[in-house]
Amino acid sequence: MEKVFERLMYASRWIMAPIYLGLSLILFALGVKFFQEIFHLLPNIFKIGEVDLVLLTLSLIDITLVGGLIVMVMFSGYENFVSQLDVGEDNDKLSWLGKMDAGSLKNKVAASIVAISSIHLLKVFMNAENISNDKIMWYLLIHITFVLSAFAMGYLDKITRTGK
């Protein structure tokens, strides 16, 4: 009975596979949104102000960072928790594929969240005249929380890896 239970529990990791595949649909949606923003910009390129162009650029960078985060979580999560990816050894293989454990993934996700939060905070500051001070304060506090959390996770990971 115990053996059956253990095999069933081990096989249940495959439940995550469609979830990782679902992330690719979100990645596709982000790509559509990215190019939708580009296509909205092109006809108005000479009408748009500098601040609005910078805000749009920051939004596109934000979408790009989120897309990279999705790719990282999708591939590393699949490799760490479901099965190894067999993509061959050609030049198209990502250099970090198969080298990122769950701890490294956690730290990279935290760093990505801080980067995304930084871009969002920069967008808030660029549009500060239209945002109340208390909302700006909350954005800043949330960002600081992300930064401190990422730092703490990295520090704890360093402590556990070195055994100090």
Curated annotation (Swiss-Prot):
What is any Pfam family matched here? UPF0114
Keywords carried by this UniProt record: Cell membrane, Membrane, Transmembrane, Transmembrane helix
Instruction: Identify the domain of life.
Output: Bacteria
Q: Name one GO cellular component term.
A: plasma membrane
| Localization in the cell | Cell membrane
Transmembrane parts of this sequence:
15-35, 53-73, 109-129, 136-156
- Principal localization reads membrane
Membrane protein topology class: Multi-pass membrane protein
Q: Into which family does the record put it?
A: Belongs to the UPF0114 family.
Name recorded for this polypeptide: UPF0114 protein Sbal_0780
